[in-house]
């Protein structure tokens, strides 16, 4: 299970894909940094989206706050996604490739 990515379903499938992505971004970004939203209009993926957060704790807060939230006239269902998002895998790989010394310096700069 991936704790950065939320699987959202029972979305109104009559909404334009770009409008849906924008509305989901506006709603979920109030809980933390959203790095990606995947909302496809294929028959298999209609009414579903994946919202990817940078921080797993932000995803947990958003899931708790928005579970059963009425969104475009339908009650959203939210759970953790089963697989890791490609964007999170890329971020982790970039951090790992920098080496431990560079990571320590970056972390020290943040403090």
From Swiss-Prot:
Pfam families: RRM_1. Transmembrane segments: none annotated. Disulfide bonds: none annotated. It is found in: Nucleus. InterPro entries: Nucleotide-bd_a/b_plait_sf, RBD_domain_sf, RRM_dom. One of its GO terms (cellular component) is U2 snRNP. It comes from the Eukaryota. Residues 4-83 form the RRM domain. GO terms for biological process: mRNA cis splicing, via spliceosome. GO terms for molecular function: U2 snRNA binding. Keywords: mRNA processing, mRNA splicing, Nucleus, Ribonucleoprotein, RNA-binding. Its main location: nucleus. Belongs to the 40S cdc5-associated complex (or cwf complex), a spliceosome sub-complex reminiscent of a late-stage spliceosome composed of the U2, U5 and U6 snRNAs and at least brr2, cdc5, cwf2/prp3, cwf3/syf1, cwf4/syf3, cwf5/ecm2, spp42/cwf6, cwf7/spf27, cwf8, cwf9, cwf10, cwf11, cwf12, prp45/cwf13, cwf14, cwf15, cwf16, cwf17, cwf18, cwf19, cwf20, cwf21, cwf22, cwf23, cwf24, cwf25, cwf26, cyp7/cwf27, cwf28, cwf29/ist3, lea1, msl1, prp5/cwf1, prp10, prp12/sap130, prp17, prp22, sap61, sap62, sap114, sap145, slu7, smb1, smd1, smd3, smf1, smg1 and syf2. Involved in pre-mRNA splicing. This protein is associated with snRNP U2. It binds stem loop IV of U2 snRNA. This is Probable U2 small nuclear ribonucleoprotein B''.
């Amino acid at each position: 299970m991936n704790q950065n990515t939320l699987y959202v379903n029972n979305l109104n499938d009559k909404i334009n894909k770009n409008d849906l992505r924008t509305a989901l971004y506006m709603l979920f970004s109030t809980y933390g940094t959203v790095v990606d939203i995947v909302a496809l209009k294929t028959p298999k993926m209609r009414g579903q989206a994946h919202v990817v957060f940078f921080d797993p704790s932000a995803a947990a807060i958003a899931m708790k706050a928005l579970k059963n939230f009425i969104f475009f006239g339908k009650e959203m269902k939210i759970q953790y996604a089963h697989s890791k998002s490609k964007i999170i895998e890329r971020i982790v790989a970039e951090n790992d490739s920098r080496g431990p010394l560079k990571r320590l310096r970056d972390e020290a700069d943040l403090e």
